[in-house]
């Protein structure tokens, strides 16, 4: 028999799941605003990043619902000023250099994907969690992987 760990207790496990979902939500909000700023420059990459920003907002809304389903309430670590600052930063980067905009967008996509990979791995082992939750997260992970692959195709053009 294996020793029981702290996360084997279902109530603690649910709290950790809510925190991991909140972390993914914060990343989506921040990265979505940054991508929205990148999209202010009307080039092909900007159009793609506008779509990625809309996808991030959609995923964020889903994550909020999932957080509520775990019995928690999503907290706002991003206000209007925060979103505006991220958008402005993205807009400034977008106008400085196409390569810099691309490299930053790629880092954001990799970071977002890694968060979903970690979240899915964590959820698979978490006791007391509805097994439908990892299944609901997986399409988000696939979508972020597709976004990264889409950026990698553009890399060949730059």
Predicted segments — roles?
Residues 1-5, 65-100, 107:
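Carboxylate-rich helix-loop segments that flank metal/cofactor sites and access channels
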Residues 1-21, 158:
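Terminal targeting/low-complexity segments that flank the catalytic cores of oxidoreductases
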Residues 17-39, 84-138:
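Acidic/histidine-rich alpha-helical segments that form the ligand environment
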Residues 32, 60, 64-67, 89, ...:
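A structural signal for well-ordered alpha-helices, especially hydrophobic packing surfaces
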Residues 43-81, 151-154:
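Conserved alpha-helical segments that form or flank metal/cofactor-binding pockets of metalloenzymes
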Residues 52-55, 109, 139-140:
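Transmembrane helix-bundle signature of multi-pass membrane transporters/permeases
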């Amino acid at each position: 028999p294996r020793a029981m760990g702290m996360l084997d207790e279902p109530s603690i496990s649910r709290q950790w799941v809510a925190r991991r979902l909140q972390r993914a939500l914060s990343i989506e909000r921040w990265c979505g605003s940054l991508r929205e700023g990148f999209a202010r420059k009307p080039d092909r990459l900007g159009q793609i990043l506008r779509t990625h920003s809309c996808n991030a907002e959609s995923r964020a809304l889903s994550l909020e619902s999932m957080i509520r389903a775990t019995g928690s309430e999503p907290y706002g670590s991003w206000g209007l000023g925060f979103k505006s600052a991220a958008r402005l930063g993205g807009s400034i980067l977008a106008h400085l250099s196409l390569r810099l905009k691309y490299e930053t967008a790629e880092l954001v996509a990799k970071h977002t994907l890694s968060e979903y990979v970690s979240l899915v791995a964590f959820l698979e082992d978490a006791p007391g969690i509805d097994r439908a939750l990892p299944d609901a997260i997986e399409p988000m992970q696939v979508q972020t992987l597709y976004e990264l692959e889409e950026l990698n195709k553009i890399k060949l053009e730059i």
